[in-house]
């Protein structure tokens, strides 16, 4: 993901010595027979200009996260774990649901879309264990869009 090449069937693993044989067999099936184009693109990832660009993007994603997560927390949409490497925020919306008379994150996501004009994903899309109280936000948007989303949520949640 760091190189923006998800789905290219390329990769490597770092594992303890005792797992090398087993993981090697698994890895062969995950990224065997990479095309020449994919291999050349992968090599280009390690050029100085490419690495500088990836570091710039990483810093931009970090800045977005560092703005957005505290802003969600201030709105009462608690993010229990600070994302480290992902561009999503997993936020607890149960207090907001109780305040707004909403049943769960499904209703919260629907209301956020139609009332605040902010698209989020209900937790149940990611499993069944305690997901009804969580929603997922993307922080991959521009900083301007994240500011707009927070402003809209704030106006909706704290009238």
Task: Tell where the protein language model's regions lie, with residue ranges.
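PLP-dependent class I/II
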Residues: 1-159
């Amino acid at each position: 993901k760091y190189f923006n090449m998800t789905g290219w069937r390329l990769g490597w693993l770092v594992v303890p010595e005792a797992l090398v044989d087993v993981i090697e067999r698994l890895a062969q099936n995950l990224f065997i027979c990479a095309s020449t184009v994919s291999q050349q693109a992968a090599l280009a990832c390690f050029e100085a200009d490419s690495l500088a660009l990836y570091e710039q993007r990483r810093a931009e994603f970090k800045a977005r996260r560092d703005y957005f997560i505290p802003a969600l927390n201030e709105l009462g949409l608690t993010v229990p774990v600070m994302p480290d490497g992902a561009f999503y925020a997993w936020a607890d919306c149960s207090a907001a649901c109780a305040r707004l008379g909403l049943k769960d994150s499904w209703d919260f996501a629907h209301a956020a879309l139609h009332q605040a004009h902010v698209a989020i994903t209900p937790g149940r899309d990611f499993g069944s264990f305690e997901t009804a109280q969580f929603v997922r936000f993307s922080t991959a948007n521009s900083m301007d869009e994240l500011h707009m989303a927070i402003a809209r949520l704030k106006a909706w949640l704290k009238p």
